[in-house]
Amino acid sequence: MKMEADVVIVGTGVGGLFSALSLPRDQKIIMITKSDLESSDSFLAQGGICMLHDKDDYDSYFEDTMKAGHYENRKESVDLMIRSSREIIHDLIGYGVDFQKQEADESGNEAADNGGETAAIQDIYAFTREGAHSRPRILFHADITGKEITSKLLAQVKQLSNVTLLEYTTMSDIIVENDECRGIIAQDKDGNEFEIHAENTIWASGGIGGRYKHSTNFPHLTGDALTISEKHGIRLEHLDYVQIHPTTLYSKKPGRRFLISESVRGEGAVLLNSKKERFVNELLPRDVVTKAIREEMEKEGTDHVWLSMEKLGKETIMGHFPNIYQHCLEEGYDVTKECIPVVPAQHYFMGGVWVDSDSKTSMEHL
């Protein structure tokens, strides 16, 4: 079988969906995903999404980002991310994403919202804080922000007549003609191979968590684009830059680790050792907190540390972190009354396929 498209997008998470929505409507687009449409890590994200408050926030936002990246970040990319963040958030709201709004003020009046015509986003929505940020600049939807964003984008894409969505379809290779990418070779769930020819190919295929025993990722995310890149000499970068999230719920059960969002620490949750003593500033960058946890575990001879959310209060926990509360309850922990055991696990892949500031790889049309 052979399919034709203007653009083929590998991956149906936030990156792939936003790309599809941003392309011209006269472009024929085919999107594929290895599993079902909702089994992408984008659906699992809990904490939120960062946004530049105003021009006065730029310098601290830039410095926070560079510091967290040990000043190895590509400055051009950091600048682009920060300066485009307000426009991206505006687009997401336009697609129906419902971020948490500010509570009513003392007079009982809620922040005005008429589509952003007269009120700025920062005057309407509530912001929380996460590690490495010097101020709250994260927009959120309870503790299921990823699900809120991705489900709304997916609903929008499903309405597009120019987009075809293929589930349970795996990219096994790319089609290369004259050193240019001209589409992909794919396999359906029965192992039948077919070609998707396209003028341009977009990889939005996720991370590498499936290669790890302990990860917060779905197991089918195995870094397929890396293997294909190595085969065709496509430039890769920083393959050793793998982020370990400090706090996942400790369990002896096999399978994906359940993430305990960094936002709980942003709201005041604290990390404790076996003696119930604090041992680290919980809002330091993730790699620093992870290192402190591992050192504490080694020093004490334990396989986890403890996280206390009790000081947040039941109202905040139930309102901001209902999913975490419910999952922990199912595992036998009431986070409103007791500490929970947490352990670091593989979470995010910061290396991968090299791209320029326009997200073009070293191969044309990819």
Predicted features and spans:
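N-terminal Rossmann-like FAD-binding beta1-loop-alpha1 element of flavoenzymes
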Residues: 7-31
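Core beta-strand elements of the Rossmann-like FAD/NAD(P) dinucleotide-binding domain
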Residues: 2-5, 190-200, 362-363
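Short beta-strand to alpha-helix junction loop
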Residues: 75-86, 136-155, 166, 215-223, ...
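Conserved redox-cofactor binding core of oxidoreductases
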Residues: 93-192, 204, 248-251, 257, ...
